[in-house]
């Protein structure tokens, strides 16, 4: 992508930030834009604490006399928005402009609110595809890193931190994501329709009982109870080459009132905490639970005479028997020229 627009501002704590907007069009030199009094806001999902995916959205407020039509796109990842901390030269947030329609009044000075969602939310519009030529067993780490690479094609984020709260055994040292495997066919239905990459991530992270979040320059798979108990060990993955190493994440507790709360008619509340179990049933109809064992189209008489049969008399009853062979793939225990009542037991 090409840098199309940029702007700089300072937070209420005097921290310098830079907003960069990238488009697929080659616009030549980047153009500086003017931001409003509320230049950039980020909002995180807060409806539930225990949630497999916690996503965020941002609003960049621009003051302009132009229409800036190239900032509105119908593509899922057509326009990228990046927020950088100039003081530490680090990535603060990045995502993509939401595909939507453009509407603006013709007035002398206009404020445009550019809405963006983070890279995890963009996965809702990307279908899962096999990692190789065909479906195969893949580790959780392979699948998750492959999906996150689709979420970030520009490679803004290279790191994935996974807390070591789950283990196969008490003495295991390897990250559980490298030890758990699943077949890729599980992500396709009976009609071969793939799940979205977002649903794939949800199913894997939910199975682990953890939460995936995009925070600054990395992705994190965390467990709130593990953090609350003071554990800081985790595995760091490189999303692009799947290399991993053990590391420690610094964790500190802060009082909300010490951080400071400033708002207008705002409130602080503690949401209810509960356990929730969701059971999903496949409602696709099954046409035939027990299909026919023998396919008539696959059978042919073993004799040149199609009317040949064998007789067997038991008491006063005469039984007629005929034997057939498969055109395709039936295998016998031993090869015989002709099956009859005397050798049938040793052939099948």
Give the residues covered by each predicted segment.
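Juxtamembrane "anchor/assembly" segments of surface/extracellular structural proteins
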Residues: 1-76, 107, 112-149, 247, ...
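Solvent-exposed strand-loop boundary residues in beta-sheet-rich modules
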Residues: 25-27, 87-89, 225
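Short, solvent-exposed secondary-structure boundary motifs
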Residues: 41, 86-88, 197-205, 323-330
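Residues that flank catalytic or metal-binding motifs in active/ligand-binding sites
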Residues: 56, 93, 110-112, 208, ...
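Short beta-strand and beta-hairpin "edge-sheet" elements
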Residues: 80-116, 213-215
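Polar, enzyme-active/binding microenvironments
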Residues: 87, 295-348
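Charged- and aromatic-enriched interaction segments used to assemble
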Residues: 106-254
């Amino acid at each position: 992508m090409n840098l199309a627009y940029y702007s700089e501002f300072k937070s209420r704590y005097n921290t310098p930030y830079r907003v960069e907007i990238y488009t697929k069009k080659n616009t030549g030199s980047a153009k500086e834009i003017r931001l409003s009094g509320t230049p950039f806001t980020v909002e995180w999902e807060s409806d539930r604490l225990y949630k497999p995916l916690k996503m965020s959205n941002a609003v960049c407020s621009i003051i302009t006399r132009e229409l800036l039509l190239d900032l509105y796109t119908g593509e899922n990842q057509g326009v990228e928005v990046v927020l950088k901390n100039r003081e530490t030269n680090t990535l603060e947030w990045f995502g993509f402009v939401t595909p939507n329609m453009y509407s603006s009044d013709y007035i002398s000075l206009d404020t445009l609110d550019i809405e963006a969602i983070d890279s995890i939310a963009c996965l809702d519009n990307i279908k899962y595809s096999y990692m190789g030529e065909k479906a195969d067993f893949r580790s959780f780490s392979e699948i998750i890193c492959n999906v996150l690479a689709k979420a970030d094609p520009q490679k803004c984020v290279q790191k994935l931190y996974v807390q070591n709260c789950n283990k196969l055994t008490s003495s295991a040292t390897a990250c559980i994501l490298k030890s758990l495997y699943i077949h890729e066919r599980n992500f396709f239905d009976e009609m071969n329709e793939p799940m979205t990459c977002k649903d794939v991530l949800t199913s894997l992270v939910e199975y682990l009982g953890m939460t995936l979040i995009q925070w600054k320059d990395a992705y994190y798979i965390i467990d709130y109870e593990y953090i609350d108990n003071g554990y800081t060990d985790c595995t760091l993955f490189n999303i692009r080459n799947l290399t991993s190493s053990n590391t420690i994440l610094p964790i500190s507790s802060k009082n909300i009132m010490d951080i400071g709360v400033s708002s207008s008619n705002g409130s602080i509340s503690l949401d209810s905490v509960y356990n929730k179990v969701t059971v999903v049933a496949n409602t696709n109809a099954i046409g035939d639970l027990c299909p026919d064992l023998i396919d008539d189209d696959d059978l042919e008489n073993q004799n040149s005479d199609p009317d040949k049969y064998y007789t067997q008399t038991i008491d006063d009853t005469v039984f007629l028997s005929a034997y057939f062979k498969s055109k395709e793939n039936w295998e016998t225990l031993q090869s015989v020229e002709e099956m009859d009542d005397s050798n049938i037991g040793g052939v099948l």
